Amino acid sequence: MGIKAEEISSLIKQQIENYESELKVSEVGTVIRIGDGIALAHGLDNAMAGELLEFSNGVMGMAQNLEEGNVGIVILGPYTDIKEGDEVRRTGRIMEVPVGEELIGRVVNPLGQPVDGQGPINTTKSRPIESPAFGVMARKSVHEPLQTGIKAIDALVPIGRGQRELIIGDRQVGKTSVAIDTILNQDGENMICIYVAIGQKESTVRGVVETLRKHGALDYTIVVTAAASQPAPLLFLAPFAGVSMAEEFMLQGKHVLIVYDDLSKQASAYRELSLLLRRPPGREAYPGDVFYLHSRLLERAAKLNETYQNGSITALPFVETQAGDISAYIPTNVISITDGQIFLQSDLFNSGVRPAINAGLSVSRVGGSAQIKAMKKVAGTLRLDLAAFRELESFAQFGSDLDKITLAKLERGKRTVEVLKQDLNKPLKVEKQVAILYALTKGHLDDIPVQDIVRFESEFLSWLDSNHTNVLDHVRTTKELAPDADYVAALTEFKKTFAKSE
């Protein structure tokens, strides 16, 4: 049986009509040098700054140095399988992270991938990790309080929503504890928290996650972690990933608290990358743009106006000092970028004053306008009194014949120090802080022995909860101080039942 020529030609025509010429064009370069998490590639002439590049083994990289003949790439993953001569391909995408509600309650790495073993995260949106900060006209001045639940902070260095408040101090002085207590205190405050751990031990991060879970705070918290064992590029990217997640919520009109723990390690990781990329070193071998690294990150924290639904990001960056030296390079940089700093001192910490906040060196440049009226009234002079007490205390060590006024100031100062002490993971609601600070500043604690102050406080606040809730409710609802008569009546009544130690 013969095949007709027409049939053959119609079959060929049919095949030609169905043929789709799919030609995939991608720009490919060649790795010419590799080592220490950095690759140098030739041939990617049109690569963009910060573009994602894909190596032949599937590992991603990020274009950092764009030079005439080659591109310096930081590798975002294991680099041991990449060799000279391997292909590296442009993706045309800028580095992005997944964002959205689905991340809440999860622990992720700086690329947004889950590391808590609880399955994949099905997000639908992503945001670029680098985006310009909002301009002047999109912002609003800080005016709403962010209650940390820590008496020493809410009274002396108040923080407002949209503020950047640096927490600075040596290692092991309770910086992380301040942040965790602040996160725990946001329960019921309609606040989303993001904790970014940079270069921490994995065991430490695990401890933080367990603390948050135990107190139910993981229900409104995202943990972003780049552990000490991970490559430097991930440590450098972690804060940017965290703030991109925060911006998504801010643009929906929500309030976000983001903690960077800590930026000294991010600066070290960036220094490592820059030196490996052969960028010229500056002071303390940091690259020239290390200030810009932190300023562009922290400027993304803002309080937005009505046009952007009044959302806010409040940032608590940490910086670790060496032997209390706050005049080093990174500390002075971040102090000049932020709206104030809380200085934690190891001497105070070791002498049992915890949180170890140095009232003299700590300052909040914009938080005063966000403080509630009740707190303003009771804590107005507290800062100055405490600073004066520290001065008098060192002076009083040398002389015994002090006049009555000086002695009274010293006694009041000792009680102030006791009242500002606080246990770990026990944040205090603002109405209770106001009650105990009222008792202190109005002289109601002057006849209580110093060693009984802590016990007096806990018993008095429990007693108020049961017997005089009107005082607490008034502050909670109106943000104003309850009438003096109510406080005096409550204190007088309670003091009759309080047993002083001998």
Curated annotation (Swiss-Prot):
Record has Transmembrane helix as a keyword: no
A Gene Ontology molecular function term of the record: ATP binding
Protein name: ATP synthase subunit alpha
Pfam families for this protein: ATP-synt_ab, ATP-synt_ab_C, ATP-synt_ab_N
Predominant location: membrane
Enzyme Commission code(s) on record: 7.1.2.2
Catalysed conversion reaction: ATP + H2O + 4 H(+)(in) = ADP + phosphate + 5 H(+)(out)
Family: Belongs to the ATPase alpha/beta chains family.
Subcellular location: Cell membrane
Membrane topology: Peripheral membrane protein
Keywords (A to Z) from UniProt: ATP synthesis, ATP-binding, Cell membrane, CF(1), Hydrogen ion transport, Ion transport, Membrane, Nucleotide-binding, Translocase, Transport
InterPro entries found in the cross-reference section: ATP_synth_asu-like_sf, ATP_synth_asu_C, ATP_synth_asu_C_sf, ATP_synth_F1_a_nt-bd_dom, ATP_synth_F1_asu, ATPase_a/bsu_AS, ATPase_F1/V1/A1_a/bsu_N, ATPase_F1/V1/A1_a/bsu_N_sf
Domain of life: Bacteria
Organism: Lysinibacillus sphaericus (strain C3-41)
Gene coding for it: atpA
Residues holding ATP: 169-176
Quaternary structure and partners: F-type ATPases have 2 components, CF(1) - the catalytic core - and CF(0) - the membrane proton channel. CF(1) has five subunits: alpha(3), beta(3), gamma(1), delta(1), epsilon(1). CF(0) has three main subunits: a(1), b(2) and c(9-12). The alpha and beta chains form an alternating ring which encloses part of the gamma chain. CF(1) is attached to CF(0) by a central stalk formed by the gamma and epsilon chains, while a peripheral stalk is formed by the delta and b chains.
Site feature: Required for activity: 362
PANTHER family: ATP SYNTHASE SUBUNIT ALPHA, MITOCHONDRIAL (PTHR48082:SF2)
Function: Produces ATP from ADP in the presence of a proton gradient across the membrane. The alpha chain is a regulatory subunit.
GO cellular component, one term: plasma membrane
Entry keyword annotation includes NAD: no
